[in-house]
Swiss-Prot record:
Species of the source: Mycobacterium tuberculosis (strain ATCC 25618 / H37Rv)
Name of the featured protein: Probable transport protein MmpL2
Keywords: Cell membrane, Membrane, Transmembrane, Transmembrane helix, Transport
Pfam families: MMPL
Major subcellular site: membrane
Family annotation (SUPFAM superfamilies): Multidrug efflux transporter AcrB transmembrane domain (SSF82866)
Family classification: Belongs to the resistance-nodulation-cell division (RND) (TC 2.A.6) family. MmpL subfamily.
Localization per record: Cell membrane
Amino acid sequence: MSERHAALTSLPPILPRLIRRFAVVIVLLWLGFTAFVNLAVPQLEVVGKAHSVSMSPSDAASIQAIKRVGQVFGEFDSDNAVTIVLEGDQPLGGDAHRFYSDLMRKLSADTRHVAHIQDFWGDPLTAAGSQSADDRAAYVVVYLVGNNETEAYDSVHAVRHMVDTTPPPHGVKAYVTGPAALNADQAEAGDKSIAKVTAITSMVIAAMLLVIYRSVITAVLVLIMVGIDLGAIRGFIALLADHNIFSLSTFATNLLVLMAIAASTDYAIFMLGRYHESRYAGEDRETAFYTMFHGTAHVILGSGLTIAGAMYCLSFARLPYFETLGAPIAIGMLVAVLAALTLGPAVLTVGSFFKLFDPKRRMNTRRWRRVGTAIVRWPGPVLAATCLVASIGLLALPSYRTTYDLRKFMPASMPSNVGDAAAGRRFSRARLNPEVLLIETDHDMRNPVDMLVLDKVAKNIYHSPGIEQVKAITRPLGTTIKHTSIPFIISMQGVNSSEQMEFMKDRIDDILVQVAAMNTSIETMHRMYALMGEVIDNTVDMDHLTHDMSDITATLRDHLADFEDFFRPIRSYFYWEKHCFDVPLCWSIRSIFDMFDSVDQLSEKLEYLVKDMDILITLLPQMRAQMPPMISAMTTMRDMMLIWHGTLGAFYKQQERNNKDPGAMGRVFDAAQIDDSFYLPQSAFENPDFKRGLKMFLSPDGKAARFVIALEGDPATPEGISRVEPIKREAREAIKGTPLQGAAIYLGGTAATFKDIREGARYDLLIAGVAAISLILIIMMIITRSVVAAVVIVGTVVLSMGASFGLSVLVWQDILGIELYWMVLAMSVILLLAVGSDYNLLLISRLKEEIGAGLNTGIIRAMAGTGGVVTAAGMVFAVTMSLFVFSDLRIIGQIGTTIGLGLLFDTLVVRSFMTPSIAALLGRWFWWPLRVRPRPASQMLRPFAPRRLVRALLLPSGQHPSATGAHE
């Protein structure tokens, strides 16, 4: 046992002594803490859904542009939208339209989740623009309420519920897809995969631990420690997120879980490896415990601080994709470090009491001693070989291509992917994911002058490379409005004359119809004149008869009056009798007396009739006398109309010969669809259809105009992103020198958003990368107390990072044929910076302990002592991260495999060969500014003063120590 170990045994530091003394209490405290944080709040996935943050960069120009469009048009104030796609087995007919109308009514009524519906298919004016060429599919864009992911997810689920509960007609299916639906499904896929990946990881780690330790009990105890760590980390992060300390995302929860598992397992392997090494060296369990703590605590602390610090540097990022990873994973790693420095030693103490952690087999260090010997013997060739291996990955980097299409990285069975596949069968990707250009000025643009400028903007953009279609007020269906060219307007003047000529010819023919009708009227009036004479004669006879009837009725009335006067007493009896109605004879006689009263009324009416008949026989002759002048006037009108018909007929025949095919020029320009001579007259602004178009493409105050631009190909690609700046440039050039000069130009949409994300990712990667590298360098210098060693660690980490990402490009892109998602680069770089220095740190820390034996011997001993442990830990960490490949979210799988490849490269190449070969080449300069001995000091001189002084005392009198050539 070395003197250092002896001193350690005699007076161990206070922290490990306290941990060993209160080991059971510490274990119980951790169990209680884990139980509390998991019972106090819901599970991490549930809290993540309730406190998720929007993944869209809210301060990006493209997102601001979309929100500005919604504000000026009074439609929406968020950037979340879904696309509802209708697909039929046959062309969509009336049933599909009725289903669509019912669905639109439901969506419009749900103002809690739906902000605005861009209903193009419901308007015949724009229906063709949102319908497939075969009429079997149509789509509508629905803007949702919610600027963060939680509200957006609720809105997506609400829309899906309405679509699912509205029965479509036979042969028609409705799908919900679009950016918001994709993001919601991404979160769902990520959350559902956590449990599956965790279970697979646990089984794989258990198998690896069995292979490493050949002990079921040791493997189970390590898994229990990791499980407690994971439960504490998950619960604590969920507790903080539930109290709004920070927000979460799908990537944060997934990476947090596997990082916690991997780091906790690594730290347990570090401790057990050093404990077993000490036990192999003959130390008792207590001494081995203190040796283990002394040799690994600072490494675990440095590793944890490195990971936590590097991950927290992501908090400086602007993109929520990265910013949401910073605080949760950093805090989780700090909890993992705290658990590793307290719970791990406590469990080791309790387990060692029952001899559970004693090694089952002796460590085989011969292989690693040979590796170390080869390195110190041939450091240059070894370093060259490692650089050659690293170049494999580095050479693959230039071929790196990325993609921004989220659909490819989620299961095809997800609802949004099913809907997107249905839409892709009928529509192009660019048509479903257009760019939106907004031009906002300080005056009303609803006039012919500004319409010319707006059409120029649309024309310039449309004629630029990579543009498939531009929809605007002057081209609502993607092409210029028909009949709006100046040649067509000129041509239509002749067409109008020709059309009017045909109309007038028809009206001339109508004159003949009128003449025929007038002839009929004249003949009818002649017959009426003759019949009127007969009517007058008959009326005179009726008048005489009426006078006679009046006289007879008066005589009848007088005789009946005499009869009634004589029988009045008897009549009174019939009216007084109460039961007269029940006696038929009584009631009939009473009715006869009532009839006598009606004779008086009849006589009176006949007298009135006599007077009217006298008036009638006076008026009828006067009416008959008016008919001959009317017949004469109508005959004259008929003759004049015949003359007018002849005159106009001759005139329009001459005009018809002069205007033959006047619309030829207009038809040619319409067929050619040349938009160089666009003009919209003022009268068009009164057209009802054009007014509907104004509402869609111009703001209510007319001061902002919207353009919907479809790119050629997929906008979520580097090629699509490259079209963004040309669109802005063409718009600025189009308004230069016009009344719209100086107008504000906004551009949003899929390509514009990913352009901002790409630029933001570069900035975030630069900021977070520089901050992480600086932080790691500082931590390494503090722990190693060597500037050169710290620089070597950081340098090899950076080299390993580049090589590992190149290997990931080689595997995913070149071998599997799947391009890496855009965020894989930034996330894997930061994570590799965070975890890549662990094994180098452990190696160099052990090398620092063994340096007293000499530089080369120390390298050999350090390689022998740490080779197996570091390789096991690195393999476990790499496999754990690589198991992300089983996630339903392929993005997570790409990130995990990239980190796994990096850790394998770092473990098997950098730590095993590159770093020790650099240390051997640099010699004592590797430890600068520390002063170290290239060779070990003499055993005889070690307990005494410096070599120069001792030799001065031992040499014969008069001999100077320098004569021996010895130097300290």
